[in-house]
Every structure is written in C-alpha cells, then in structure tokens.
Amino acid sequence: MQWTALEPTKELQAILGFNKAQNWDDFDLALRDFMAPAQNFVFADKSGTIAYRANGHVPIRKIGDGKLPVPGDSSDYGWEGYVPFDELPTVINPEEGYIATANNEIVGEEYPYYITDFWAQPYRYERIAQLLESKEKLSVQDMKDIQMDTVNLYAAEFLPHFIETFKAADTADEYSQIIASLEAWNYDETIDSGQSLVFNFMMEEIKETLFKDAMPEDVY
C-alpha cells in the first residue's frame, strides 16, 4: 500500500512557518513543507493580498489513476514522483476579489496532471460565491452568517424539474398540497423545513430506484 502520508513529512514545521509568515512569500515557502494529506489552503494578509493553493504531494502515476487496486508485484504501476510544487493549482489576487473553496473541482481538462475525479459537487462553492458577491463590503457578522448558511442550491437546480413532472402525473391532485409547498420553498434547509425533508427523501428514493437493482448488493 503506497500513500503519501506514510512517507516522512514535515507538516509541523510547515504549520510553525504559517504562524510566523509575514506575507504570501513567507506562507508560500512554508507550504513546501506541508506534504500530506493534500489540502486546500487560503491566505490573506493585512496588505490585501489573498491567495489559494491546492497543496501537498500529488503522485504522478506511470499507469492508471489510483481508483482501483493494481498489481503490487510490478513497478509498471509505480509513481514517477509528485506534481512539481510550482505547478500545483494556485490563485493569487484573482479579479473576483475573493477566493472560495469547498472541495469543488479546481482544475479543468487543460491541467497537465491528474489529481482526482472525486470532487465535491459545486453547489457549496456556488453558494459561497453567491453570498460573497451579494455585498460590496462584508462584515464579521456577514462572514458568520455565511458559515451557518443552509440554502441548498442542489435543490434549486433539480426541484423545479421534479415539480413539472409531479404536475403532469396522474396523482397530481392527490399530492397537490405537497406540490404547492415545494413550489413555495426558498431552498433553505432550516431544521424545521418540511420541504427539505421531502426533497432529501426523494433524492434517496431516486438513488434506490436507479442503482439498487442494477448493482451487486455487496458494493451498493
């Protein structure tokens, strides 16, 4: 079993460097010592510089992408080092004026190295960006509110299509109250939201309907 975190690393030294950093160059230098596990790092200093780096050791594989086990008795499937530090995904002072990250996909097809296919769905990132762009200047309270925000853009994308289907179904009259309630929903998943309960139940049922009978029981 080969894993970057099983190799000698210097994360504690990196963290000490973060705490002593006076600017992005200092922080960037300390990042060189943070090797595993790979992390999304965001940076800001009092001069106004903001930056982001997807940092850590990312293997360059001779064959394959690491999704499935490979023969361990052949060097053909080994690693050819790591993605060079200076080629890790990095953003410094973007035009948007902010940086947001939520484990979303950070590189496109043009990026020359394989990182992973297991990105989070984009909805959390999109909601963060939506809130950051909602005001020209954000207060500390605004930032606290962003941390506690529960609006579900996943529901906002899919639910309107479901509602159209419900209305066209033979059972539309029977479930008219539920349909009307879902139509009125603002997609905020508060603790007492009945619409949120219905939506998430539907998503679980869709998963069951699509995949349960099509996949072996031991891998579902």
Segments from the language model and where they lie:
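Glycine- and hydrophobic-rich flexible loops that cap the catalytic core of alpha/beta enzyme folds
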Residues: 1-77
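Long, compositionally biased non-active-site segments enriched in small/hydrophobic residues and glycine
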Residues: 45-220
